[in-house]
Every structure is written in C-alpha cells, then in structure tokens.
Amino acid sequence: MVLGLISLAATVPLTATSVLSLQSQAETRRSQGVDNAWKTNKSYLQARASNRTPEDRKALFDGSKVVLHDGLLYVELQSSAVKRHPFTGYFLAYPDSKYDGLVSTISKDPPQLNWIFLDTSSLQIRHGLRTEAETGITGPFGAVMVAPSEERRILLEGWEGFIAVESNQPGLWGLYFDRYDDALKGRVPEGRRTVELELVHEDIEGDSQQS
C-alpha cells in the first residue's frame, strides 16, 4: 500500500531498503491466508468498559473510541465536544524483533504513521517515531478472538491490561496499561476515576493493505 511506504519512510524513520523490507513482510503475512490477513487491514479501536466495571461508569464508555492527541493515546467518550484523530492503524512487524508492533496515522493530511508504545515510567500508551518508541515497550501487540461474537480484542505482552484514567479534559480519559497488575498503584492522581477496558479491533470497511 502506498500509504504505508510513504508514511513509514517519512516518520519512523527508515531507509528505503528497510521500508521495502517491511512491505515485503506484510505481503508475506497476507499470502499466509485469511487467518492473518486482518492484521494488515487498517482498523479503529473501540474502547469498552469491562464487565467488572460499575454500571454508572460502564455507561460512560458507550460508543467511545481510542484517539491520538499530543503524543498520547486517549479514550474519547461519545459525549466529547472536541473530536480528535482516531486510532487508524494496523499490526506491523517491529524492526529487528520477532514480534508485532502497532502503527497508526497521526492525522488525515498528511497521513503519517507513528509507532504505538508503552511509556515504562507512567504506563501510559503513547505514539511517536521509532527513536521515541524505543524508549518504551513496543510490543508484542496481538489480539484474542472472543466467542461467540468473534470480536478481536487487543493484547499487549500477551494480556488485556488496559485501563482508562480520567483526565482534566472533559470527555477524554488517558489510556494506560496495568503492566504490573496492581491497578496502576502510585500512578493515578488522587480523585481521578479509573475504568478497566477492552479494546476492540474494528476493521475499516473496504480497506486492505493493497496498492
């Protein structure tokens, strides 16, 4: 796909040879069959409160989605008056590794790509160039298919540990990863609400990584 070549070359940054290598890897994955083809299709990420969430907070997240804003990933509630750029990306083999990373466009024009990564200090999910991403955890990202709906939910390091933390901006919650399974102990400002999340992979209809 032309977008992938231009965006990666402009933002990761990579040499022309590296960009062509990544495209080749994506083509190889597609050739492996339909079981893997979905990974290279652009998608949105819908955010949903887990079943363990109190009903009053769960309702807040109806129709919410993951967005990118000022180098960070957030959950934007449907009630938000300001609409930010939605996560619009796909899985991509992370350079010089044996695992998949995640990339997303950061704007509509130009449609540049950034890597998605975990800030190891704050445990907030961020986006940036490869040099920025490598200061944090770049993967492995994956997905699990959940029956009976057959929806795919995003994993990081093999599990669903995503948490939304209320921010000081109306309708916007920070996206965090509870890496140590301790409810983000010591990292949540006093008085801020938190919600355990499921991130649902939603294919963009009609899109495929083909030029």
Where does each model-flagged region fall?
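Acidic, polar low-complexity intrinsically disordered regions
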Residues: 32-141
